[in-house]
Amino acid sequence: MPEKPGKADSPERWKRRTFLKTCGAVLAGPSLPGAALAEWWAGELPAQSQTSADKSRGRPVLERANPIVGTGWRGHMFPGAAAPFGLVQLSPDSSGPPDAKWNIQGDWYEWQHCSGYNYRDNVISGFSHTHIQGAGGIDLGDVLVMPVVEGKNWSWDPGKIEVLNEMQIAALGTDAGIVFSPSELGYRSFFSHEHESARPGYYSVHLQTPDVQAEMTATTRCGMHRYQYPAATAGVRQGLVVDLAHGLNCRVYAAELTVESSGRISGQRSTHGWAQDRHVYFVMELSHPAAAVEVSVDGAIATAQPGSEFSGKEIKLIFTRTPASGPLLVRVGISPVSLEGAAKNLQAEIPAWDFDEVVHQTGRSWTDALSTIDASFSQSSTEETFYSNVYHGLVAPAAYNDTDGAFRGQDGQNHPNPGFTKYTTLSIWDIYRGEFPFLTLLQPRRVNDIVRTLVLDYQQLDQHALPMWPLWGNETWSMIGFHAAGMILGAYVRGFRDFDIEAAYAAIRDTALVGAEARGNRALQAMFRQYGYVPSDLREGGVSSTLDLSYDYWSAGAMAELLGKKDDSAMFYKLGQNYKNVFNPATGFMQGRSKNGKWRDPFRPDQEFDDYVESDAWQASFSVPHDVQGLISLYGGDAAFVDKLEGLFTAPSRVIDARPDVTGMVGQDAQGNEPSNHHPYLFSFAGAAWKTQYWSREVAALYNNTAAGIPGNDDCGQLSSWFVLTALGFYPVNAATGVYVLGSPLVDRASILNPLTGSKFTIIAENNSAENVFIQRAELNGKELHRSWLSHQQLTTAGELHFRMGRTPNKDWATAPADRPPSGFIPA
């Protein structure tokens, strides 16, 4: 029986959680590794995945990355065109396959379309200009464009989608029949993956219903389309729909449109969604003037003349093409600031009607970004998996300034150029773990600006708190903790100092001692300080909040220590030990307890009680990255810890009351959820580096180069960066320290370019293969390496790491305490 709403639950949230839990066992699908998972997810294998060994050898790096990877299963990726860290992501919004299990009423269906697209779909609604990469939240989808042909899909509306509820699914079985019929399509179109292709900065698809070939590319702030219509037929109109009412789970509360001419429009829309108050401005131009322009405002249709202005909540427009005018090009400038900003962005980034040149220039940007790593593999499919994940790791965060530097702040006001690139779409709870360290290695020029963004957001929010999940000038306050503190610390430790460190520390301190009132965070942190943990009878997610806050307070303490603030350091370090207060020695797990100290009873470690966030007790009990040695002590020493940790990977994968986002299971380890990402690397802290090598390979096998190739929500690059770093042979357990724990490299050879100095760090894995997963011997710069970790400074300096791999483990390597990764230690 579903539980009753808790104190922290609204009725709506309780209803949503109850529904997802009820459906979880059916919807989550089996917990399957790698190929078996893809096999179950029928239809998930794009043509690009059918590679043979050697096929990609010698291909330009741009052709090795496949944006379609991760667009199915639970990856929540979009396949469309974007520039590195671009604000515009021009991509199809899709819907509806003929599959009963797929079309679930309400949040489940929407959640599977967080990026606007899912590979299982067979219908495209149109192409919108803004998307979120791999997140578990849904928003954006601004300024949708769709070609239409009379008698095929000419319509003002997107048609109807039949969404089945769970009772209908039970009645129909596994085959629901056709979700759409042609009369219900509206302006949507059927499509086939056989006629769809993507590479970084470019996307194309054949729209079957109107018989239109659609292509698109993007720059940082602009999008460009090219549409090839069928040969004109007398009396049959061809046109282009522009839908300002379309959105991804966001509601338009105000919109404006100006028809400046028959080939140029401009406007804005304001939405309520995950981002509570978002404003988007655009300028759109056509390569050929339209023969007619019609506008629908809240259902009333009128012919528009140059200079016509419209306002309302639901504004749509149809351009009627001039017959026999050739391919239609469309260019769109986007701005979060103003119409003037959108026009300036368009003029600066796409000044001419040369689609191929924009594709070329954006491709060059991607080539430069992807070429920071030069990696080779024995299998070309692994190479494509690798570079696809590098690509995904370079999509977010998004640059949030106009070309003149102006931006919309967290205070809801427009601001002039702050002197740096302002960023948005920062999934901090996710990316602090691996994505941000990944960026410090591959994109160091962006690191100081990301930190400046965090501090500026703190100042403009005026909430006594650093941001948690900023999205388009809105703080969503999503997830838990204040992990921006660890990001600032991690940047500082790695030598990034071109920001106001005193202002940054003031932001960390204020967040730690006061915190945001939003979502009850201030009260939650007060509970943490008062009780020494977050009581589960007072707040949902008490165990996970306790663990995350322990890390955050440790981060504040480490930052204070580095700045010579001894009293603060002692205070925060003490709070960083609060994780011990939710460890129940009787069960051997991190466990919920009430304000009176009573442990949750009954208790099962494989059940998703409300004490945990994106985890159960198995997965949460190892979330102490700042004090792994302390965690080992709680378990009774090295041997007991290794046994417990191995139990995580070998336990049955069933999770009771699992939400649909519990994915990527290896035993009870859930790679699809971020709290599990560091688990394979913990063995090395107890002197069992060979087990880190084994289990990191097992988890990496969940990834592949298909649409189902990412084992969960990518969350703005976190799961992708995990694979990239793991394939290179290392991963940061405590992301703030600049320490990377060595694992088992997938690369045969790789070099990492430091863009700041031009130096290269080379990794060689001799005798590497799918069977030879164990390090026999390691050398750093020609000298034998006995320890199982490297520092950020070593990885960003010219050097060579040479592994000799083998089939049997070298159980003596890196076993001495001095050779194990430091826990909570920040190297000079």
Segments and roles (model prediction):
Residues F774:
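Extracellular attachment/recognition segments
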Residues T51-G486, G490-L547, A560-N581, T587-M590, ...:
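Accessory carbohydrate-recognition regions in carbohydrate-active enzymes
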Residues M1-T18, A25-G29, W41-G43:
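N-terminal secretory signal peptides
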Residues E12-R13, G34-E63:
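C-terminal segment of N-terminal export signals and the immediately downstream linker at the start
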